Curated annotation (Swiss-Prot):
Protein known as: Peptide chain release factor 2
Cell compartments where the protein resides: Cytoplasm
Stored InterPro entries: PCRF, Pep_chain_release_fac_I, Pep_chain_release_fac_I_sf, PrfB
Organism: Campylobacter hominis (strain ATCC BAA-381 / DSM 21671 / CCUG 45161 / LMG 19568 / NCTC 13146 / CH001A)
Keywords annotated in UniProt: Cytoplasm, Methylation, Protein biosynthesis
Main location: cytoplasm
């Protein structure tokens, strides 16, 4: 890097900060923060626990946004001042140090941009994920299992926690179906872009002739909704079945019918839960998942109406990403149109860059 390149970088980063400022409007946020702090001083607020919690979440969200913005703004201003002073004093050592720190400065401002992309209505919520294999029997079930492992490894990398709601093992390999909650900061904001059809091309380990196979699996990501969000579900639209736990994920096999399967007849959405020994808790968890899925379905319907996007079956529906392991190794996201060569690392959970690239593409 030379002086010209660094000067251009500072200009570019200043433009990014200005764009973020135009989006978040710090003065308006500071005014709202002052209003919240005044409201918190009113004893009447704490009588309504739900409202108090809602106000508290809003305060935390605004405070975090303002803190990140101020930090990035200060870092950029400091870098600019140090650089101008170093140039005027012909201080090569300081200039070279600033050059070395430039990547970190760029990364911090990129993180600020990303946090703005994760400021949607439900982005701060936990994510409920369902993975279901497409046609192809063992091939599809194994691919669904590979995707589940990918998300588990991603969560381990970034510090998210997972709660399994329902886990149905495949007959020979992989999984028939899995529902789980990902808990952590902006879990839904990051993982919402994973909803869609994932396609795998590889030499099948289940084919003695060593032929190439294509497999599909669907991923549905929905936000874990707060209890105060009302989703109207008519009891007559539900079919509720109780059955014995199958020992999901190596857990206990229950001798009572504590596992719950709920079918929403109008949409044919089926949710299951068997993670608890208590039938009532499993039913409550299943209803939470159903509520989340119906909320997401309604949102998708509105998007499809505005985009006029037709919907198809799992094999040929809305593919979002291709994973090719043979004859070459490549993962390509069909929305950002970016190809990645580290297929094995990606399947081992290294997907943060892919998620961020899609989020950035969706904003452009």
């Amino acid at each position: 890097m030379d002086n010209y390149e660094y000067s251009e970088l500072l200009k570019e980063l200043k433009n990014k900060i200005s764009n973020v400022e135009a989006i978040i409007k710090p003065k308006i946020l500071m005014t709202r923060l002052a209003e919240i702090e005044k409201t918190e001083q009113d004893p009447a607020l704490w009588v309504d626990a739900k409202k108090a919690a809602q106000i508290g979440r809003e305060k935390t969200k605004i405070s975090n946004i303002l803190a990140k913005f101020k930090k990035a703004q200060n870092e950029l201003n400091d870098a600019k001042e140090f650089y101008e002073l170093a140039v005027s004093e012909n201080d090569g050592e300081t200039i070279n140090e600033l050059f070395r720190e430039s990547a970190k400065l760029s990364e911090n401002i990129a993180n600020l941009e990303l946090s703005m992309m994760l400021s949607g209505e439900n982005d701060d919520k936990n994510a409920i994920i369902n993975i279901h294999p497409g046609a192809g029997g063992t091939e599809g079930e194994d691919w669904a299992g590979m995707l589940y492992r990918m998300y588990v490894r991603f969560c381990e990398r970034v510090g998210y926690k997972i709660e399994i709601l329902d886990f149905q093992e495949g007959d020979e390999a992989g999984i028939k179906d899995v529902n789980f909650i990902v808990k952590g900061e902006n879990a839904y904001g990051y993982l919402k872009v994973e909803s869609g059809i994932h396609r795998l091309v590889r030499i099948s380990p289940f084919d003695s002739a060593g032929r190439r196979h294509t497999s599909f699996a669907s991923v549905v990501v929905s936000p874990e909704l707060d209890d105060d969000i009302q989703i109207n579900i008519d009891e007559k639209d539900l079919r509720i079945d109780y059955y014995r736990s199958s020992g999901a994920g190596g857990q206990h096999v229950n001798k009572t019918e504590s596992a719950v399967r709920i079918t929403h007849i109008p949409t044919n959405i089926v949710v299951q839960c068997q993670n608890d020994r208590d039938q009532h808790k499993n039913k409550a968890s299943a209803m939470k998942v159903l509520k989340s899925r119906l909320y997401e379905l309604e949102k998708l319907k509105k998007q499809e109406e505005s985009n006029k996007t037709p919907k198809s079956d799992i094999a040929w529906g809305y593919q979002i990403r291709n994973y090719v392991l043979f004859p070459y190794q490549q993962v390509k996201d069909l929305r950002s149109n970016i190809a990645y060569s580290q297929a094995e690392a990606i399947l081992d959970g290294d997907i943060k860059k892919i998620l961020e690239d899609v989020l950035i593409n969706n904003q452009s």
